[in-house]
């Protein structure tokens, strides 16, 4: 039986992680370690100025007073009795497509698995109602089983986005590239009860690059999107042009 580490950024009691853990437990030994609160948008942040504390919950999960990245790092380095065969992060309540991936704690948790030498996938449910976590969990389980026979390179992760639809309405799977959003909308300014100004982040930008071949396009058409991601952010097509002038400064 394989060993799977499960984490997320929505918190240890979120419906997505419960559905994911249940589906994977049908064929694997699963350890679920996740933040004790919602950490959406935490990206790859680590807790460096405070100690991490764990809490063993009644359902066997472990909560941590840290970020998604903290959870995966702590689990692999300290809590897992046997090194996991794979890290699975999710199921996120909402899309992680295009630019979202740079902010996502869900994707970051999977990336931390990759940084520690393990294959990893991030799974998100895309839609307005967010009720079909069972659909996303089924696909997550299928993908994990597939990776046992077709391992991915350890310098990448798979980013999976599943439409919020009943299983029978999913049209299939498409391997995609990341799309892109327009820039985010403005800040929302209001006041607290004491009359002091406070600010909220505005909505994310609307879809900009969402055509054929993108994650946005696949999900909108009713397909599960799977995008292989790597941590190398180098803009290779800019290297020569930049070197032509900047080394002369």
Curated annotation (Swiss-Prot):
- Signal peptide segment: none
Q: Which UniProt keywords apply?
A: Cytoplasm, Hydrolase, Metal-binding, Nucleotide-binding
GO cellular component, alphabetical, reads: cytoplasm
Compartment(s) of residence = Cytoplasm
By its UniProt entry, which InterPro entries does this protein fall under? SurE, SurE-like_Pase/nucleotidase, SurE-like_sf
Q: Which Pfam families match?
A: SurE
Q: Which cofactor does it need?
A: a divalent metal cation
Q: Which EC class is this protein assigned?
A: hydrolase
Where the protein is mainly located, per its record? cytoplasm
| A GO term, aspect molecular function | 3'-nucleotidase activity
Where a divalent metal cation binds, per the record, is at 9-10, 40, 92
What does it catalyze?
Answer: a ribonucleoside 5'-phosphate + H2O = a ribonucleoside + phosphate
Keyword set includes Hydrolase: yes
Co-factor binding comment:
Binds 1 divalent metal cation per subunit.
| EC annotation from Swiss-Prot or TrEMBL | 3.1.3.5
* Function per UniProt: Nucleotidase that shows phosphatase activity on nucleoside 5'-monophosphates.
Q: Which family does it belong to?
A: Belongs to the SurE nucleotidase family.
Name of this protein? 5'-nucleotidase SurE
Q: Which organism is it from?
A: Shewanella frigidimarina (strain NCIMB 400)
Organism phylogeny? Bacteria, Pseudomonadati, Pseudomonadota, Gammaproteobacteria, Alteromonadales
């Amino acid at each position: 039986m394989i060993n799977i580490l499960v984490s997320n950024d929505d918190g240890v009691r979120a419906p997505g992680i419960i559905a994911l853990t249940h589906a994977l437990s049908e064929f694997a030994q699963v350890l679920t370690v996740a933040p004790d609160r919602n950490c959406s948008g935490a990206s790859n942040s680590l807790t460096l100025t405070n100690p991490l504390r764990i809490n063993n919950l009644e359902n066997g999960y472990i909560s941590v007073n840290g970020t998604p990245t903290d959870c995966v790092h702590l689990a692999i380095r300290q809590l897992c009795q046997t090194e996991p065969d794979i890290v699975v992060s999710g199921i996120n309540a909402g899309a992680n497509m295009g630019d979202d991936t740079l902010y996502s704690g869900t994707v970051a948790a999977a990336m931390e698995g990759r940084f520690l030498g393990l294959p990893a996938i991030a799974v998100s449910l895309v839609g307005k109602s967010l009720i079909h976590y069972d659909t996303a969990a089924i696909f997550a389980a299928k993908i994990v089983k597939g990776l046992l026979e077709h391992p991915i390179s350890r310098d990448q992760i798979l980013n999976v986005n599943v439409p919020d639809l009943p299983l029978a309405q999913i049209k299939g799977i498409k391997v995609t590239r990341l799309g892109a959003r327009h820039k985010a909308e403005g800040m929302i300014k209001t006041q607290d009860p004491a009359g002091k100004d406070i600010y909220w982040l505005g909505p994310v930008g609307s879809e900009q690059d969402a055509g054929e071949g993108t994650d946005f396009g696949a999900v909108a058409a009713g397909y599960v999107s799977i995008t292989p991601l790597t941590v190398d952010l180098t803009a290779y097509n800019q290297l020569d042009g930049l070197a032509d002038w900047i080394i002369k400064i």
